[in-house]
């Protein structure tokens, strides 16, 4: 179908009964992005979070009213209350909103309203969706299409995880963790992979999770496009069930769009792109490390070409892409008691994500010692993937573990960081160093652990990034 249809800009009149929007958990990455877009549309935005942060401060500077802590009176003037999946039904603000008969909606419902009046491009998948969303939004921006985007991470070039554009495209990271991606009605959907995560919301069944992705893809119109990574076994297995136009990508020979001649030079990837329906290929340099990011770039390339972006713009955009915060982000070079080291931070909290980054680091820094500092995220994930974590983390030259970031969960016997330490030790390849108090990690690294020219990578989706930033005090002047 012709995608040159011009969709009307979302304006206040589309939700004319709504003036005041309250976000419970406004500091979360997904929530804050939607709040920022709505602020820029002229709505009165307020919200609460359990702690002050750079995100809440940024929104306050933009004009949002921020409450630190939850209280019933916070929602009394709201026309609608938006909640994230992390907010319990017994939250005092949620209970008060229901008592006052104020509509309470999920984050994805508000995102769906933003998407309703635009050409929606939704990115889903267990891993890689933040980077893929960022690459896609960047290519559309480079092409002058001025998209609106809502991303689960900070797009470095924009300095934000959201932006209201004047164009008619909306690029959004979707969330499969709580099934809320079923609420979206995009025109193009990307699925990067399907891994066994968040199964508690899918009856504990991987097959049910895969069926959930099929349902998400069937929200596309019959003339929409599903962009699917055929290299992923889970995605490949659902292909026969997807009753929408499909374009696959990957390294596999049967992919519609393939990356060939892939090589890593330093922290950049070089590869050629070839499509099964074309005779010629074109060469790409991606300003990110790792084969997993080559796959993410292929998805963005397909979307760009589907929307008519010329190849030179795509090639230039990928070469100049500035990355996403907390995705193998280089904090800088530091001085310590035994020499110097490079410090990186990555959001990876699943074995597959961590392995991809470690592979890229070992390739990009061949011959240098890799020191990983890992904060497990959720007791359930640590329990369910204990052996996988142990296998992946055992390849490090040096490994530091700290206690599990609970993310609201109660402790589970056999699923804390000490249990993970024992499981890794059993592999016999690396002797993990357990440091319970995060405040002690930097002193131990600086004085006892690091050797000259080490590469340090902080992994985790919790608050380990705060520890990585503490290393900034040791940075040397460039």
UniProtKB/Swiss-Prot annotation:
Q: What's in the GO CC field?
A: cytoplasm
A molecular function (GO) term:
UDP-N-acetylmuramate-L-alanine ligase activity
Cellular compartment(s): Cytoplasm
Tell me the residue numbers annotated for binding ATP.
125-131
The record's Gene Ontology biological-process terms are: cell division; cell wall organization; peptidoglycan biosynthetic process; regulation of cell shape
Q: InterPro entries attached here?
A: Mur-like_cat_sf, Mur_ligase_C, Mur_ligase_C_dom_sf, Mur_ligase_cen, Mur_ligase_N, MurCDEF_pg_biosynth, UDP-N-AcMur_Ala_ligase_MurC
Which EC number(s) does the record attach to this protein?
A: 6.3.2.8
Entry superkingdom: Bacteria
The catalysed reaction is: UDP-N-acetyl-alpha-D-muramate + L-alanine + ATP = UDP-N-acetyl-alpha-D-muramoyl-L-alanine + ADP + phosphate + H(+)
- Alphabetized UniProt keyword annotations: ATP-binding, Cell cycle, Cell division, Cell shape, Cell wall biogenesis/degradation, Cytoplasm, Ligase, Nucleotide-binding, Peptidoglycan synthesis
What Gene3D superfamilies does the record tag this protein with?
Answer: Mur ligase, C-terminal domain (3.90.190.20), Mur-like, catalytic domain (3.40.1190.10), NAD(P)-binding Rossmann-like Domain (3.40.50.720)
Mind telling me what this protein is named?
UDP-N-acetylmuramate--L-alanine ligase
- Give the organism, scientific name: Dichelobacter nodosus (strain VCS1703A)
């Amino acid at each position: 179908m012709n995608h040159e249809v011009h969709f009307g800009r979302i304006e206040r009149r589309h939700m004319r009964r709504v003036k005041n929007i309250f976000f419970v958990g406004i500091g979360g990455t997904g929530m804050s992005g939607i709040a920022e877009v709505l602020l820029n549309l002229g709505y009165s935005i307020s919200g609460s979070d359990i702690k002050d942060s750079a995100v809440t401060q940024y929104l306050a500077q933009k004009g949002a009213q921020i409450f630190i802590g939850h209280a019933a009176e916070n929602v009394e003037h709201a026309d609608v209350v938006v909640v994230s999946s992390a907010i319990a039904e017994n939250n005092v603000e949620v209970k008060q909103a229901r008592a006052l008969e104020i509509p309470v909606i999920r984050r994805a419902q508000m995102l769906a309203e933003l998407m309703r009046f635009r050409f929606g491009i939704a990115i889903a998948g267990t891993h890689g969706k933040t980077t893929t969303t960022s690459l896609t939004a960047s290519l559309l921006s480079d092409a002058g299409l001025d998209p609106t985007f809502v991303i689960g991470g900070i797009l470095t070039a924009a300095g934000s995880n959201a932006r209201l554009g004047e164009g008619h495209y909306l690029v959004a990271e979707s969330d499969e963790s709580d099934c809320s991606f079923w609420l979206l009605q995009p025109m193009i959907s990307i699925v990067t992979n399907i891994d066994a995560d968040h199964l508690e919301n899918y009856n504990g069944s991987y097959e049910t999770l895969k069926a959930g992705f099929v349902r998400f893809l069937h929200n596309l119109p019959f003339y929409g496009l599903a962009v699917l990574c055929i290299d992923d076994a889970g995605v490949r297995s659902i292909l026969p069930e997807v009753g929408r136009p499909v374009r696959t990508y990957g390294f596999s020979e049967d992919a519609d769009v393939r990356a060939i001649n892939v090589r890593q030079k330093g922290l950049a990837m070089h590869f050629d792109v070839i499509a099964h329906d074309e005779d010629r290929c074109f060469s790409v340099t991606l300003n990110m490390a790792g084969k997993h990011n080559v796959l993410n770039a292929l998805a963005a390339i397909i979307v760009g070409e589907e929307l008519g972006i010329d190849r030179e713009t795509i090639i230039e955009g990928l070469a100049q892409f500035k990355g996403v915060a907390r995705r193998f982000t280089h904090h800088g070079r530091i001085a310590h008691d035994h020499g110097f080291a490079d410090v990186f931070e990555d959001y990876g909290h699943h074995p597959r994500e961590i392995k991809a980054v470690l592979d890229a680091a070992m390739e990009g820094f061949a011959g240098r010692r890799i020191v990983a500092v890992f904060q497990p995220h959720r007791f359930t994930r640590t329990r369910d993937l204990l052996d996988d974590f142990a296998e992946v983390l055992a390849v490090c030259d040096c490994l530091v573990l700290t206690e599990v970031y609970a993310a609201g969960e109660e402790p589970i016997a056999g699923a804390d960081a000490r249990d993970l330490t024992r499981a890794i030790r059993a592999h016999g390849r690396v002797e993990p160093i357990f440091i319970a108090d995060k405040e002690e990690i930097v002193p131990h690294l600086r004085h006892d652990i690091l050797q000259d020219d080490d590469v340090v990578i902080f992994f985790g989706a919790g608050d380990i990034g705060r520890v990585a930033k503490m290393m900034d005090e040791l940075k040397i002047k460039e």
